[in-house]
């Protein structure tokens, strides 16, 4: 969908072409070297100096304005209430389909924001660690719905974010292995009072059903101060997923510890057919039923073309 087409009706977003958005960088300095940018790029994603300059530096500048505004509001509220409250981290959510490039975007933002003056502490977690272990998913018949909302330990994720917002430290998050495709037992990431926390995951903008009794039911995005949705057309996403699957077949799948080790010796045709089947059965269904409907809840939408380059940017009006 062309985001500009929606401007024929009332639209809560301001839509920018790539060139229009790039001009909003103003004097935001480039703080990453070419080799650092290359290290931030995920497999089969595209990230270069131009993409950082034209897309991510304007976003970094925008976020610096939002964060500073939130800090001023926090100080004013504390003065109004007459209390000395703990520092409240600014939380940024990064959402979007499998294979769209969420991890790359999250890492780039972490690198850029950490180099603001005077050097804020910027942490990054993914919601993968809050998935149920494979044994639990298998027991409940949910392995084919891994990544769907029901496959996550939602109360645990909500408790984690609540503790972060409350300024508690340290707060622990479980570790997920993409090699074994499972939670790593007795392994944790510790987050200790960051200035900014980036939370990346497919369903972080998901809403819950409204309760009939009127009681508040928190959702993950309730804890976000800003959110980014990575967008691309479904056929493009499928193509990226298939290409990534083929690349992993030639690399990570050859590790005997890999959950997908059984696919390591597939031919190109067999691997392509397998990847398409997985996409249609799981990832496309999750995209259409759970992920795409949350796009209108994002603060900012980055729309990518088939070459992985951001073509349009939509910023929610205040």
Swiss-Prot record:
BP-aspect Gene Ontology terms: coenzyme A biosynthetic process
GO molecular function: ATP binding; pantothenate kinase activity
EC code: 2.7.1.33
Pfam families documented for this protein: PRK
Keywords of the record: ATP-binding, Coenzyme A biosynthesis, Cytoplasm, Kinase, Nucleotide-binding, Transferase
SUPFAM superfamilies referenced in this protein's UniProt entry, alphabetically: P-loop containing nucleoside triphosphate hydrolases (SSF52540)
Entry's localization field: Cytoplasm
Top-level division of the source organism's lineage: Bacteria
Catalyses which reaction(s): (R)-pantothenate + ATP = (R)-4'-phosphopantothenate + ADP + H(+)
Residue positions binding ATP: 96-103
Pathway the protein contributes to: Cofactor biosynthesis; coenzyme A biosynthesis; CoA from (R)-pantothenate: step 1/5
Coiled-coil segments on the chain, per record: none
GO cellular component annotations of the record: cytoplasm
Record keyword Oxidoreductase present: no
Family to which this protein belongs: Belongs to the prokaryotic pantothenate kinase family.
Name under which the protein is recorded: Pantothenate kinase
Classification lineage: Bacteria, Pseudomonadati, Pseudomonadota, Alphaproteobacteria, Hyphomicrobiales
Gene this chain is encoded by: coaA
């Amino acid at each position: 969908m062309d985001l500009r087409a929606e401007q024929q009706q009332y639209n809560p977003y301001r839509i920018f072409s790539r060139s229009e958005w790039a001009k909003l960088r103003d004097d935001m300095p480039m703080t990453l070297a070419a080799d650092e940018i290359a290290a931030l790029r995920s497999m089969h994603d595209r990230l270069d100096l131009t993409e950082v300059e034209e897309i991510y530096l304007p976003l970094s500048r925008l976020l610096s304005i939002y964060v500073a505004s939130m800090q001023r509001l926090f100080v004013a509220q504390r003065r109004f209430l007459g209390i000395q409250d703990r520092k409240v981290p600014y939380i940024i959510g990064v959402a979007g389909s499998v294979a769209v490039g969420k991890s790359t975007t999250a890492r780039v933002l972490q690198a850029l924001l950490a180099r603001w003056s005077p050097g804020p502490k910027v942490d990054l977690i993914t919601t993968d660690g809050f998935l149920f272990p494979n044994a639990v998913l298998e027991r409940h018949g949910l392995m084919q719905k891994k990544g769907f909302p029901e496959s996550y330990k939602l109360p645990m994720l909500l408790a984690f974010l609540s503790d972060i917002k409350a300024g508690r430290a340290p707060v622990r998050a479980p570790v997920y292995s993409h090699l074994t495709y499972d939670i790593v037992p007795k392994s944790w990431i510790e987050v200790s009072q960051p200035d900014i926390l980036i939370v990346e995951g497919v369903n972080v903008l998901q809403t819950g059903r409204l309760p009939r009794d009127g009681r508040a039911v928190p959702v993950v995005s309730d804890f976000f101060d800003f959110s980014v949705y990575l967008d691309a057309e479904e056929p493009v996403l499928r193509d990226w997923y298939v290409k990534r699957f083929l690349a992993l077949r030639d690399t990570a799948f050859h590790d005997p510890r890999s959950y997908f080790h059984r696919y390591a010796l597939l031919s190109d045709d067999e691997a392509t057919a397998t990847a398409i089947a997985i996409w249609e059965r799981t990832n496309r269904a999750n995209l259409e039923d759970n992920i795409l409907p949350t796009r209108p809840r994002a603060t900012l939408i980055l729309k990518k073309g088939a070459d992985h380059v951001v073509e349009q940017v939509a910023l929610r009006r205040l």
